[in-house]
């Protein structure tokens, strides 16, 4: 039995590993010649960590996951704590620690784990079709591949999604721009073992520790889409948007490198009613394009891969397995997309009265409510 996996990112590679572990031969195709992650880092929460370990890639997370032991929200003007608490109760309840990981390291290590030579690069898919014995897929270079079934893990701009859904869904602008990158840890900005977030005015500035003594940082600003901003104006743009913010935020703006800082207009897509058509299944961002507001995009792709691989361990009935995959994943990923959207709206001042109420809640937060919410999301995954 042979699977065609379209996409060599986190979703595609984890799917390929899961299928290989189930004894299925996979061919992996990637559109670009060199994968460059869109964001500087990825949040791998305990549900994702469990999935990586389940797939046999736990060492990658242990090597590159940052020491995120505490969580704090800070006032945007004074830089003083609104709330600060240990994440130890979350680790105890979920059986794993949260691991922010540099995206480039994660991508590279997963690629090495699978085998770089086992990925066909420069293969941009144009279409697919099913036939009695399996599936065919065509690429822009005129080549074609055949397999018994196909996993479309070709990202949020998936070319194969319309085949599965029967329509082309529109991406929805979430209403804010995100700048992100990596800087050396500076305790004058934030503790090196803490996820620190400054909030105010419907904006946020956040830092998470990753490997090699670095912070993953991001700035969020509610803005119209399509503004003429690029790296040449980046520091000035951030200085303007965060004028008057706390000294730590100003230090971060001064410390970042505009040439390695990403600027992304954040989108999501309305959750889908289906993830499968016949012998073709959507996986990862192709199947559930979400905002990053609860940090579950990468974790959801890993969950997809675990469910898919485990189902094929139990059965070789392709149609039946893919139906079960859809049944097990549709509600879960819908929940994650909509939770992220709700969190996005509160964080970014869609209704400033609600956002101000959240800021006030943070002043009385002991950690219990936030940890309960995180645990509910994490424990909804396939590995508990």
UniProtKB/Swiss-Prot annotation:
Q: Where is this site: Involved in substrate activation for the transfer of oxygen from the flavin hydroperoxide?
A: 204
Tell me where on the tree of life, at the top rank, the source sits.
Answer: Bacteria
User: A Gene Ontology MF term for this entry?
Assistant: FAD binding
- List positions binding substrate: 178, 204, 216-218
Which EC main class describes this enzyme? Answer: oxidoreductase
Which cofactors? FAD
Q: Which reaction does it catalyse?
A: urate + NADH + O2 + H(+) = 5-hydroxyisourate + NAD(+) + H2O
Residues where FAD binds: 11, 30-31, 43, 125, 285, 295-299
Sorted alphabetically, which Gene3D superfamilies does this protein's record hold?
FAD/NAD(P)-binding domain
| Pfam families given in the database record | FAD_binding_3
UniProt GO BP: purine nucleobase metabolic process; urate catabolic process
Q: What happens when the gene is disrupted?
A: Mutants fail to grow with hypoxanthine, xanthine or urate as the sole nitrogen source, but can grow with allantoin and allantoate.
Q: What is its EC number?
A: 1.14.13.113
Q: What keywords is this UniProt entry annotated with?
A: FAD, Flavoprotein, Monooxygenase, NAD, Oxidoreductase, Purine metabolism
Tell me which InterPro entries the record gives. Answer: FAD-bd, FAD-dep_Monooxygenase_BioMet, FAD/NAD-bd_sf, HpxO
- Carries keyword Transcription regulation? no
Record pathway: Purine metabolism; urate degradation
Q: What does this protein do?
A: Catalyzes the hydroxylation of uric acid to 5-hydroxyisourate.
The family classification in the record reads:
Belongs to the FAD-dependent urate hydroxylase family.
Q: What is this protein called?
A: FAD-dependent urate hydroxylase
- Species name for this entry? Klebsiella oxytoca
């Amino acid at each position: 039995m042979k699977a065609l996996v379209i996409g060599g990112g986190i979703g595609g590679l984890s799917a390929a590993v899961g299928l290989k572990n189930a004894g299925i031969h996979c061919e992996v195709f990637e559109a670009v010649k060199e994968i460059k992650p869109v964001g500087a880092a990825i949040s791998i929460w305990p549900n994702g960590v469990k999935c990586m370990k389940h797939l046999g890639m736990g060492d990658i997370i242990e090597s590159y996951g940052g020491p995120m032991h505490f969580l704090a929200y800070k006032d945007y003007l004074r830089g003083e704590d609104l709330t600060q608490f240990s994440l130890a109760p979350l680790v105890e309840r979920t059986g794993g620690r949260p691991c922010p990981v540099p995206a480039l390291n994660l991508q590279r290590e997963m690629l090495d784990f699978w085998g770089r030579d086992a990925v066909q690069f420069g293969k941009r898919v144009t279409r697919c079709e099913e036939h009695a014995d399996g599936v065919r897929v065509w690429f822009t270079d005129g080549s074609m591949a055949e397999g018994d079934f196909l996993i479309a893990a070709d990202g949020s701009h998936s070319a194969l999604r319309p085949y599965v859904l029967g329509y082309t869904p529109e991406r929805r602008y979430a209403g804010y721009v995100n700048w992100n990158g990596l800087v050396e840890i500076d305790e004058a900005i934030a503790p090196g073992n803490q996820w620190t977030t400054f909030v105010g005015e419907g904006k946020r500035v956040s830092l998470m520790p990753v490997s090699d003594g670095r912070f993953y940082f991001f700035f969020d600003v509610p803005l119209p889409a399509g503004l003429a901003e690029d790296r040449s104006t980046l520091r000035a743009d951030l200085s303007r948007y965060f004028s008057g913010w706390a000294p730590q935020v100003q230090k971060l703006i001064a410390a970042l490198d505009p040439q390695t800082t990403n600027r992304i207009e954040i989108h999501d897509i309305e959750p889908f009613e289906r993830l499968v058509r016949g012998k073709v299944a959507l996986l990862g961002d192709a199947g559930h394009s979400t905002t990053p507001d609860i940090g579950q995009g990468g974790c959801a792709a890993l969950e997809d891969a675990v469910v898919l691989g485990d189902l094929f361990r139990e059965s070789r009935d392709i149609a039946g397995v893919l139906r079960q995959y859809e049944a097990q994943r549709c509600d879960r990923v819908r929940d994650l997309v909509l939770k992220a959207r709700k969190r996005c709206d509160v964080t970014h001042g869609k209704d400033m009265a609600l956002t101000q109420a959240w800021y006030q809640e943070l002043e009385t937060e002991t950690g219990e409510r936030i940890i309960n919410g995180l645990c509910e999301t994490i424990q909804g995954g396939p590995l508990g």
